[in-house]
């Protein structure tokens, strides 16, 4: 059953069209030059990154990938400086995590009818740039395929609050809490207008638990949070794409360590080549380009044995789903 859309009140909070169009034009104008001369890696930063092992995990989680939609984008805008006419397939997915003490979702991504229910909240021309291909598998149907109902979910952890990581909340009970850093909530929900990639409708009426990253450095990341105190679910700081972007490092019951990196990158190609997104779309959707590039360096320096899954990396998401 399709619910009504998130309403005119939330659409009124979107950024006006003219400023968005001006940002798009500026980003487009900057893109050709960065195709020829991509941003150089910070070799000093790489040389000074310390790699600290994560704590030993005394518990493990079961992980299920819920692929909901796909889309495609030119490879040359996903990783600037890559001179290719090819398109890269991108995924949109939620991730079900079952811990001995809780069942939760990383990135409750999409609801059924997201094109009509959520995308109208975004300023023009953003919906034209980000809309997934149809059909879209709604979150409740994706969960039902694994015999799980929305009422079975204890809480959700969005890697950040862009629309395509939280729209599935419209299909979860209002009692399901959102856990995330307070700085992310303040950025997305403060002020008269939502940031360009944020739709506030799915977030309205929700309980938020502000989880601060007050734990020690882990791997190449400066701050962490051991969610259950057993090393199985660690939140790490991936600020840049948004002010409160986080990664979720899991100790999975197949023996692997999986890091969900949200939109810190859209593809592992960026990590391998140390490339940020092209100015279009990076200048439109990355809140702090310098911080985002620093985060890519931290991902590049990860040790072997960490499986990196960016939310839109179709190859990585599909490979994890097959395990």
Language-model features: locations:
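Core dinuclear metal-dependent hydrolase active-site scaffold
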Residues: 63-68, 82, 87, 93-98, ...
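Active-site environment of divalent metal-dependent phosphoester hydrolases
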Residues: 51, 72, 161-167, 243-246, ...
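Cap/insert and terminal regions of metallo-dependent hydrolase folds
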Residues: 2-3, 127-141, 254-323
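Active-site metal-binding motif and surrounding structural segment of the metallo-beta-lactamase
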Residues: 118-179
